[in-house]
Curated annotation (Swiss-Prot):
The gene is dxr. InterPro entries: DXP_reductoisomerase, DXP_reductoisomerase_C, DXP_reductoisomerase_N, DXPR_C, DXPR_C_sf, NAD(P)-bd_dom_sf. Pathway: Isoprenoid biosynthesis; isopentenyl diphosphate biosynthesis via DXP pathway; isopentenyl diphosphate from 1-deoxy-D-xylulose 5-phosphate: step 1/6. GO terms for molecular function: 1-deoxy-D-xylulose-5-phosphate reductoisomerase activity; manganese ion binding; NADPH binding. This is 1-deoxy-D-xylulose 5-phosphate reductoisomerase. It comes from Allorhizobium ampelinum (strain ATCC BAA-846 / DSM 112012 / S4) (Agrobacterium vitis (strain S4)). It is an enzyme of class 1 (oxidoreductase).
Length: 397
């Protein structure tokens, strides 16, 4: 018997308490749980009760809260369990350094960049749900993974679909990729209607169950903007090879077009566990308890071009792709600030794009990054400028 194949696979989940993290743990449970997987580390933020519960159920070796104020609470919850506890950015780094073979990168925002880079540098396979690694760090992140010797397996449903449909053996015949977008809750709204929408309305996605940040990003289509930039780096595409189409039913997750006119698409019910299961079992496929697609019940599949007047995020992504350099990092940082301002009711829904465009134009002359410190510097500059713009927006509301 080959004992190497019988050893549990070592996993770390960066961001286990969010939507992606909880779905990942469900997939792990379905695929055999502790009999097949050794959980090295779980990380979360403020929900330490859930984090502690997850750590106890999975037998994780380390539990980390990125909120240093929650360290004592987490330590108390895990007292006597034998599970190590850490906190803050140093705790995230400790989790990333543990010898996991496979790391789910699901921390939302720029906070997930450094620990994911650390895991990639030591050679782990990265199941990538964090958008900022590619949007902000781009080629630097790709190069880190290459040097480490691991793989990137996308977890976004759109990029997972492209990953599954893209034939690398015939890469020279690739013409385009088509990212599908649901259009979110405001697909049929006018700009006037969108001007006064609330946070609660914006977070109510018609198809997917997601966290607040991703739900608002779907409503504004900034999620799709980030995915366009991700796709460029992940699949080594030119800007004109990247298309976006609105598909309200979210059944076709994305498509790849080839030079002979063929288009390959990946279909399925909207359930993140499918993409997570593929990332965890790649290059095989897992047997998962998810709903199956019933074609007899599909009344129709609709497609429409995105309205760039109502959803300028797509236009801003194209600008970032054309400018290159650090524009992705700038767009991402400005969007995070604009999102926070909208959630805190400092600016309106449509003003988020105004903030991002101002910051991108203001910092359009930044030199390309040569080291990761350049990315963090651009991120800081963009956030400072965004806060200035948000302050002025608030005064004029």
């Amino acid at each position: 018997m080959n004992t190497a194949t019988s050893q549990p696979r070592r996993l770390t989940i960066l961001g286990s308490t969010g939507s992606i993290g909880t779905n990942t743990l469900d997939v792990i449970r379905q695929m055999g749980g502790r009999d097949r997987f050794d959980i090295m580390a779980l990380t979360g933020h403020g929900n330490v009760a859930l984090l502690a519960e997850q750590a106890l159920v999975t037998g994780a070796r380390l539990a980390v809260t990125s909120d240093e104020n929650q360290y004592i609470a987490l330590k108390d919850l895990l007292s006597g369990s034998g599970i190590d506890v850490a906190a803050g950015s140093s705790g995230l780094q400790e989790a990333a350094c543990l010898e996991a073979d496979w790391v789910m990168a699901a921390i939302v925002g720029t906070a997930g960049l450094q620990p994911t880079l650390t895991a990639a540098a030591r050679g782990a396979d990265i199941a990538l749900a964090n958008k900022e690694c590619l949007v902000s760090a781009g080629e630097l992140f790709i190069e880190t993974v290459r040097k480490g010797g691991g793989k990137i397996i996308p977890v976004d449903s759109e990029h997972s679909a492209i990953f599954q449909c893209l034939d690398e053996n015939h890469r020279d015949t690739l013409e385009r990729i088509v990212l599908t977008a649901s259009g979110g809750p405001f697909r049929t709204f006018t700009r006037q209607q969108m001007a006064d929408v609330s946070v609660q309305t914006a977070r109510a996605h018609p198809n997917w169950s997601m966290g607040l940040k991703v739900s608002i990003g779907s409503a504004s289509m900034f999620n799709k903007a980030l995915e366009m930039i991700e796709a460029k780096h992940l699949f080594d595409l030119t800007p004109d090879q990247i298309e976006v189409i609105v598909h309200p039913q979210s059944i076709i997750h994305s498509m790849v077009g080839y030079s002979d006119g063929s288009v390959l698409a990946q279909l399925g019910v909207p359930d993140m566990r499918t993409a997570i299961g593929y990332a965890l079992s790649y290059p095989k496929r897992a047997a998962l308890d998810v709903d199956r697609l019933d074609f007899t019940k599909l009344a129709r599949l609709d497609f429409e071009a995105p309205d760039l007047d109502r959803f300028p995020a797509i236009r801003l992504a194209r600008t970032a792709l054309e400018r290159g350099g650090l524009q992705g990092a700038v767009l991402n940082a400005a969007e995070e600030c604009a999102f926070e301002a909208f959630v805190e009711e400092k600016i309106g829904f449509l003003a988020m794009a105004d903030v991002v465009e101002d910051v991108m134009d203001h910092l359009s002359g930044l030199a390309p990054a040569t080291v990761i410190a350049d990315v963090f510097a651009a991120d800081a500059q963009a956030r400072r400028r965004a806060q200035e713009v948000i302050l002025n927006q608030g005064r004029t509301r």
